[in-house]
Amino acid sequence: MGGKDIDRLIEERRKQQNIEEILPELQLEERLIYANRTARVTKGGRRFSFSTLVVVGDRKGHVGFGHGKAKEVTLAIAKGIEKAKKNVIRVPIVDGTVPHDVIGTFGATKIIVLPARRGTGVVAGGAAKPVFELAGYTDVLTKIIGSTNPDNVVRAVFDALLQLKTPEQIAEERGLPVEEILRRYRRYALPKMNIKHYYPWRGIYEQT
């Protein structure tokens, strides 16, 4: 799974969601994850450039990320922001958290994402936290396994977000009313989520 093309998956999701139509209306915040300076040796000496990773989001269910590269750091950041806007997708939020547990992977990085009760906060480290915050999640539990490289982490988070299903989608799959899905979610999922002793809880939607 580590070789998946996250950029292609994002592009497909954007088309499904018609993001381009609403993008100009979104009030997007920006967060710089990193700005690295690199040097290239040429006959004329060393030439420096900057590479950046930026996350944008409206804290209302829309989030994206992008990379920028330029000779000036400000221009590299601007390019990162522009690319991040072109990668914005809509993600489902239920009671401030994710609608179900999910595992995202990219390269040598795996991230476990679990729903959390109100008041828990965004329990995420490194590059993962700003993605969840700018997406609009206020309570979520996460655990990163493997590489903590910011690029891998961000892409692993987006892999997880792309797998999330809305309560409406789950209800349709289960043949149940949305209200019943939410009832089971609040009764069985939230009280039992534990990042230290995690195992998949999607079976909660089959409980009565």
UniProtKB/Swiss-Prot annotation:
With S4 and S12 plays an important role in translational accuracy. One of its GO terms (molecular function) is structural constituent of ribosome. The keyword Cytoplasm does not apply. The N-terminal domain interacts with the head of the 30S subunit; the C-terminal domain interacts with the body and contacts protein S4. The interaction surface between S4 and S5 is involved in control of translational fidelity. Keywords: Ribonucleoprotein, Ribosomal protein, RNA-binding, rRNA-binding. Residues 28-91 form the S5 DRBM domain. GO terms for biological process: translation. HAMAP family: Ribosomal_uS5_B. Pfam families: Ribosomal_S5, Ribosomal_S5_C. InterPro entries: Ribosomal_Su5_D2-typ_SF, Ribosomal_uS5, Ribosomal_uS5_bac-type, Ribosomal_uS5_C, Ribosomal_uS5_N, Ribosomal_uS5_N_CS, Ribsml_uS5_D2-typ_fold_subgr. This is Small ribosomal subunit protein uS5. Coiled coil: none annotated. It comes from the Bacteria. Part of the 30S ribosomal subunit. Contacts proteins S4 and S8. SUPFAM superfamilies: dsRNA-binding domain-like (SSF54768), Ribosomal protein S5 domain 2-like (SSF54211). Belongs to the universal ribosomal protein uS5 family. GO terms for cellular component: cytosolic small ribosomal subunit. The lineage of its organism: Bacteria, Pseudomonadati, Aquificota, Aquificia, Aquificales.
